[in-house]
Amino acid sequence: FLGMPFIGWLAKRGLTPDQGTMVNQIWVNYIRDIAKDTIKFIEEVYYPDLMAMAPFYKDWFKIGGGLSNQNLLCYGDFPRYANDLSEKSLLMPNGAIIDGKLDEIHPVDLKDPNQIKEFVDHSWYQYPQPDAGLHPWDGITDPKFELGAGTEGTKTDIKWLGAESRYSWIKAPRWNGHAMETGPLARMVLAYAKKMPEQTELVNEALSKAGVPIQAMFSTLGRTLARCLEARMMAREMLRCVDELEANIKAGDEVAANMEKWEPSTWPLECKGVGPAEAPRGALGHWCVIKDGVIANWQAVVPSTWNASPRDPKGQLGAYEAALLGTPVAVANQPLEILRTIHSFDPCLACATHVLSTEGQELCKVQVR
């Protein structure tokens, strides 16, 4: 229920109308039943439950927005036409929104060395030029567990982090110098801004039922709602894909993948490329550099790298950090509100949240998983 199907178990089987271990009519019918069951659960349980609870938590439509009403990033995915990544083909859009300007969508080019750069000023890594940002093709992952200025305590018992401290094993990726949020909310808002019909209809329906404006999407509950709406859309898309798969097989089209560049011996000795995807948690990119026929560098910038990133040289906060600013906590030693906002990102990591008093005394420590 994260917004998209995982098809590895299917794709590796191959396509053929014959019986045996390959995908045949029996398997197609089985997959269709899974798609229908998924739609049934989402439409009869997941979505109604969320919409039933939303009126009791309307204040969470105003909390936890962070970067969501400012900077959003999507790589685009799910082309409906084979090998066509144009805007008319993509179900999930490509683009970036900066400073909350929904009427100004910027194209995202993952091969442009100036668009995406990672910084390590507040991370436990080192670069030859400490303040410089590196495009993933030039990326360096060289650990250096150094606490930095302003830190009180030891490496095994940190008491206080200063503004100049290093505090994360995550780098700080930035798009054209901006901290970005990525994920279902970014995709749904970008699609809404582009007036893509399926997403626009889903968002308008949900907002109407909840009795809130579009601005409510930029929040903790809006982030949770976006994931549910995307699940509705992708479950329907999964059923459509099954029907298309069956039609292709019946028409004699048994091609399962573009094999044009599958054989490594056909590649240049030196080349570089990038493999992007819109994963459940957001924009995912793997950048690869090949020299002398072998991999010389491989860098992955995953959705949680964007969302959980630490500060950058400009002091810009990552999406998690920005979303927690201004969050009211009713009981200091039971900070459920912090958990609620971080969980809305669906984090793929475990982290500790320390709640401190204004005097610097630790009130509690909560593991976020």
How would you name each of these model-derived features?
Residues L284-A300:
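Short beta-strand elements
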Residues F1-R281, D292, V302-R369:
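Active-site bordering "gate/hinge" segments
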